[in-house]
C-alpha cells in the first residue's frame, strides 16, 4: 500500500480462509519454512476504503492516535461505526473506547449498543420521519418502530431524531404523532382502518407486522389495536400472527361444514379448495376442531353422527 521510512511498508493481506487477528499482534512471513519478513497487525478488519484513505487510517493506527482514528471512522462511515470489537481493533476496552468517542465533535455515542454516529446522519432519520408523515398524517411512531425500518440506526439514535422534531411531532403514551392531531381520534381512526383492512382481506389476512408497516404504526400501538378489536369480538386470533375478521371466519367455517357433508377435510384439501397456504390451512382446521359435530381421525376431519 505504501512504503515508509526504515524499510517499513503498509501491506494488505488477502487470505483464502477467515483468520482471526487483533491490533498490534506480531506476525512473521514464511517461505519454504524460512522467515522472509514480519510485522504487526494494524487493522485486523477489512475496511471499504480507497488506498489513500486506507493509508491515512493506518498511519493513525501505527502512531496509536486512536482519537484521530475514531474521528476518521466517524467521517468515513456515513451510518456510524461500532465499538463492540474495540479490543480486537484497537486493544481498547469498551469503557475506554466509549470515553474516547465522547471526546469527538459532532457525534452521538450510543453507549448501550456501542455505536458512534456522526450527527449529520441524524438528518436522514428526520427526513424519513417527514416522509412517513407526508404519506400518512395519522402515523404512530416510536424509536423502536423506526429502528426496525432504518437498519443502520439504533433505537437510541432514532429516539434522538424524534425528540429533535418537536416542531412537527407531539408525544403521548410513548407514541410520537403529527402535531395538532387529537390522540384519541388518531387511535380511533387507526382502529377503524385496521378493521377495514382485515375485513377486506377475508380469509387471507396479512401478518400483523405487514399491516403495521402499511398503516405506519409502531408495533406496540398495532398490537394494542388488534387486542382491542379482538376484545370487541370483531376479530379472532387463531395463532401468534394470524388475526381474521370474525364474519369471514364464520363464513369459512360454514363452508367447511357444508363440505364435510360429502367429504373429509385435511390440510391438502383445505389448501386446494380455498387456495390457502399450509399455515392458514392448519390454523383453520384447528379452529374447526372446536365444533362438536367435527371429528378428527389422524389428520382428516369428518362429521359425526350427532
Predicted regions, residues:
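Charged, often glycine-enriched C-terminal and inter-domain segments
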Residues: 1-30, 36-45, 49, 220
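C-terminal non-catalytic scaffold/interaction domains in large multidomain proteins
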Residues: 20, 35-306
Amino acid at each position: 500500500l505504501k512504503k515508509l521510512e526504515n524499510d517499513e511498508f503498509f501491506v494488505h493481506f488477502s487470505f483464502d480462509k477467515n483468520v482471526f487477528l487483533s491490533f498490534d499482534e506480531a506476525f512473521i512471513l514464511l517461505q519454504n519454512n524460512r522467515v522472509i519478513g514480519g510485522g504487526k497487525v494494524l487493522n485486523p478488519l477489512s475496511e471499504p476504503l480507497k488506498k489513500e484513505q486506507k493509508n491515512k487510517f493506518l498511519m493513525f493506527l501505527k502512531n496509536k492516535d486512536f482519537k484521530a482514528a475514531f474521528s476518521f471512522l466517524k467521517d468515513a462511515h456515513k451510518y456510524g461505526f461500532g465499538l463492540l470489537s474495540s479490543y480486537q481493533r484497537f486493544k481498547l476496552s469498551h469503557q475506554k473506547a466509549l470515553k474516547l468517542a465522547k471526546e469527538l465533535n459532532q457525534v452521538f455515542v450510543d453507549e448501550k449498543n456501542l455505536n458512534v454516529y456522526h450527527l449529520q446522519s441524524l438528518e436522514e432519520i428526520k427526513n424519513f420521519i417527514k416522509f412517513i408523515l407526508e404519506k400518512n398524517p395519522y402515523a404512530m411512531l416510536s424509536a423502536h418502530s423506526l429502528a426496525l425500518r432504518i437498519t443502520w440506526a439504533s433505537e437510541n439514535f432514532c429516539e434522538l431524531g424524534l425528540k429533535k422534531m418537536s416542531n412537527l411531532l407531539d408525544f403521548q403514551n410513548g407514541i410520537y404523532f403529527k402535531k395538532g392531531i387529537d390522540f384519541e381520534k388518531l387511535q380511533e381512526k387507526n382502529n377503524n382502518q385496521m378493521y377495514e383492512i382485515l375485513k377486506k382481506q377475508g380469509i387471507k389476512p396479512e401478518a400483523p407486522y405487514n399491516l403495521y408497516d402499511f398503516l405506519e404504526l409502531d408495533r406496540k400501538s398495532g398490537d394494542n389495536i388488534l387486542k382491542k378489536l379482538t376484545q370487541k369480538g370483531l376479530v379472532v386470533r387463531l395463532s401468534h400472527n394470524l388475526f381474521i375478521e370474525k364474519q369471514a371466519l364464520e363464513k369459512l367455517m360454514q363452508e367447511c361444514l357444508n363440505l364435510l357433508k360429502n367429504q373429509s377435510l385435511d390440510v391438502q384439501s383445505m389448501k386446494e379448495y380455498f387456495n390457502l397456504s399450509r399455515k392458514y390451512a392448519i390454523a383453520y382446521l384447528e379452529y374447526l376442531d372446536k365444533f362438536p359435530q367435527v371429528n378428527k381421525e389422524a389428520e382428516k376431519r369428518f362429521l359425526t353422527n350427532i
